[in-house]
């Protein structure tokens, strides 16, 4: 039975899930609007402060008006009590033939029926109560609703004081709040107490009217303040919004956008300052574009101009190298060094030309649909001798099935060749892992070494041109310092990603992620960039891949 009750409770609360989620969504939407709208915050803050001021002012004014009305009422009631006391003294002590109850009733009727008196009209209508407490052999006597008189007030009157008190009374002709004024009398009847009950219905109506009028005026005033705040905030926010829109268009490349200048106030000075800043930025951007164009043109022109003399030098060097056996050992060694440096110089010129094409935006893809595994094997064939010279073991892990992708095989092979050669340079004779994996949309290749690694922040710098983490390290691959910079440009040309991870002493990992179909956007990668801490060298490659790698090495 208990478990059933719990299930019912959970079901009842579970039904409120959509409501809670809806309220959460609404709250987030309102919070977003609040954070993004300066005008809304200004108007809301103005209304909040105005409402607080109106409430405080209304409370103070209402309290003062109420106190003043009641003060006038108490004063008029006190004067009426003085007149009533004289009337009661004359009636009660006039004829001894009447009984005490008759005298008290006659005095009460006289007081109540005295409506023509102008002075009584100032205090308003009232009811009278006459009380004579019992004293020894004399019995107590009273006239009027004596039960409505508070005992605390009677105690003050018995002590000979004229006092008043607010109380809620219920008589034959009235029910509600009233002012009760009590006073002792000086008549032949000792200890005679006189009480006048003044209804406060007129005063209540007046106070309610005052409160209603002030509330209505406060609402109207609050609405006017809201309209004024909206107009003022709009006057302030409009130039800011205009500046924001123009800044966005300026960031999009519309360098001629400027803010309109109206008047000579603070907003006008803001517009002038903004326009001056935009003009300065536009001028600097144009200068940088001109410098960049000059730099790219210089790089391209120099690379082309150097090709002609380099070709001549290459022909002469090859001729000398072909007859190097006839030279003495020193000249033979010099010839070999010259040929090697010419090879490196030619590679540098080719890389500079490729960089200039990327900078000029004229690099194009020659897309083919092929099995990307063959491209990986081709890259291994080109750098296998480097691994053999450095004593580095290359492990390959690729899928058994074909991985068909629409890529430029020359550029992808160059990316992989640069990554593997870079890993061999920094592996410190430790293994280098090459892994490939694919999903429905993308294919990824990671190159992992366990060498010196990367310091924090260097995972971005490795793709900079001519950047080296350790200038004293010798490149086994004879690179130019532009390989990774060209590789990341080639990856972007495929709409792919080239990312790096590394830690000092733990090695580095480079991940290339490409779309299987040209034009698709890469959002995820089938391989992780940061390896798990317990990760060991990858599983052994297939027989076909092993044979291909062994042949290349």
Swiss-Prot record:
Gene3D superfamilies membership: 1.10.287.130, 6.10.340.10, Histidine kinase-like ATPase, C-terminal domain
Keyword Thylakoid (UniProt): no
Protein's membrane topology: Multi-pass membrane protein
Domain (HAMP): residue spans on this chain: 234-286
Keyword Phosphoprotein: yes
Localization of this protein: Cell membrane
Summary of the function given for this chain in its UniProt record: Member of the two-component regulatory system MtrA/MtrB. Probably functions as a membrane-associated protein kinase that phosphorylates MtrA in response to environmental signals. MtrB may be active only at septa where it promotes MtrA phosphorylation and MtrA regulon expression, probably playing a role in cell division.
Histidine kinase domain segment(s): 301-518
Disruption phenotype: Grows poorly with filamentous cells, often with bulbous regions and a chain-like phenotype indicating possible defects in septum splitting and cell wall metabolism. Increased sensitivity to lysozyme. Decreased expression of the MtrA/MtrB regulon genes dnaA, ripA, and fbpB.
Transmembrane parts of this sequence: 42-62, 213-233
Region Disordered, annotated ranges: 523-553
Gene: mtrB
CDD domains: HAMP, HATPase, HisKA
Classification via InterPro entries: HAMP_dom, HATPase_C_sf, His_kinase_dom, HisK_dim/P_dom, HisK_dim/P_sf, MtrAB_MtrB, Sig_transdc_His_kin-like_C
Record's keyword terms, sorted: ATP-binding, Cell membrane, Kinase, Membrane, Nucleotide-binding, Phosphoprotein, Transferase, Transmembrane, Transmembrane helix, Two-component regulatory system
Organism: Mycolicibacterium smegmatis (strain ATCC 700084 / mc(2)155) (Mycobacterium smegmatis)
Taxonomic superkingdom: Bacteria
Bias (Basic and acidic residues): 544-553
One Pfam family matching this protein: HATPase_c
Top-level EC class: transferase
Annotated NCBIfam families: MtrAB_MtrB
SMART domains assigned: HAMP, HATPase_c, HisKA
GO molecular-function terms, A-Z: ATP binding; phosphorelay sensor kinase activity
Catalyzed reactions per annotation: ATP + protein L-histidine = ADP + protein N-phospho-L-histidine
Protein's UniProt name: Sensor histidine kinase MtrB
Residue positions, PTM Phosphohistidine: 304
């Amino acid at each position: 039975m208990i478990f059933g009750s719990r299930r019912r409770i959970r079901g009842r609360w579970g039904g409120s899930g959509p409501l809670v989620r809806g309220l959460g969504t609404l709250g987030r939407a309102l919070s977003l609007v609040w954070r993004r709208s300066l005008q809304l915050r200004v108007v809301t803050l103005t209304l909040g402060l105005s409402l607080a001021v109106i409430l405080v002012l209304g409370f103070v004014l209402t309290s003062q008006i109420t106190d003043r009305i009641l003060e006038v009422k108490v004063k008029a009631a006190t004067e009426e009590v003085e007149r009533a006391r004289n009337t009661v003294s004359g009636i009660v002590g006039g004829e001894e033939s009447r009984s005490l109850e008759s005298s008290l009733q006659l005095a009460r009727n006289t007081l109540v029926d005295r409506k023509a008196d102008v002075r009584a009209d100032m205090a308003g209508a009232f009811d009278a109560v006459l009380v004579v407490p019992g004293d020894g052999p004399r019995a107590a006597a009273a006239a009027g609703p004596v039960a409505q008189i508070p005992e605390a007030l009677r105690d003050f009157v018995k002590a000979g004081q004229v006092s008043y008190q607010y109380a809620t009374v219920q008589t034959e002709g009235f029910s509600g709040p009233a002012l009760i004024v009590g006073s002792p009398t000086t008549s032949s009847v000792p200890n005679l107490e006189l009480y006048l009950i003044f209804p406060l219905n007129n005063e209540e109506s007046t106070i309610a009217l005052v409160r209603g009028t002030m509330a209505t005026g406060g609402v109207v005033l609050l609405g006017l303040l809201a309209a004024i705040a909206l107009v003022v905030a709009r006057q302030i926010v409009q130039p800011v919004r205009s500046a924001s829109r123009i800044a966005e268009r300026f960031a999009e490349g519309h360098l001629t956008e400027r803010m309109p200048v109206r008047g000579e106030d603070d907003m006008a000075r803001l517009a002038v300052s903004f326009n001056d800043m935009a003009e300065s930025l536009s001028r600097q951007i144009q200068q940088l574009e001109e410098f960049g164009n000059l730099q790219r043109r210089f790089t391209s022109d120099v690379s082309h101009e150097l090709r002609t003399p380099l070709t001549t030098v290459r022909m002469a060097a090859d001729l000398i190298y072909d007859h190097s056996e006839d030279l003495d050992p020193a000249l033979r060694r010099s010839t070999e060094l010259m040929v090697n440096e010419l090879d490196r110089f030619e590679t540098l010129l080719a890389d500079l030309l490729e960089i200039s094409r990327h900078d000029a935006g004229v690099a194009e893809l020659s897309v083919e649909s092929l099995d990307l595994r063959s491209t990986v094997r081709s890259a291994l064939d080109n750098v296998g001798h480097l691994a053999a010279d450095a004593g580095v073991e290359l492990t390959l892990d690729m899928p058994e099935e074909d991985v068909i992708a629409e890529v430029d095989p020359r550029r992808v092979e160059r990316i992989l060749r640069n990554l593997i050669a870079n890993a061999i340079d920094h592996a410190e004779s430790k293994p280098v892992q090459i892994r490939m994996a694919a999903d429905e949309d993308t294919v990824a290749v990671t190159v992992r070494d366990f060498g010196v690694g990367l310091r924090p922040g260097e995972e971005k710098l490795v793709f900079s041109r001519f950047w080296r983490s350790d200038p004293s390290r010798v490149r086994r691959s004879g690179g130019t310092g532009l390989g990774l910079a060209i590789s990341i440009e080639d990856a972007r040309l495929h709409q792919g990603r080239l990312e790096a991870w590394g830690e000092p002493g733990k090695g580095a990992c480079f991940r290339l992620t490409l779309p299987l179909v040209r034009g698709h956007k890469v959002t995820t990668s089938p391989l992780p960039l940061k390896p798990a801490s317990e990760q060991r060298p990858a599983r052994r490659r297939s027989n076909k891949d092993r044979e291909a790698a062994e042949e290349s090495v």
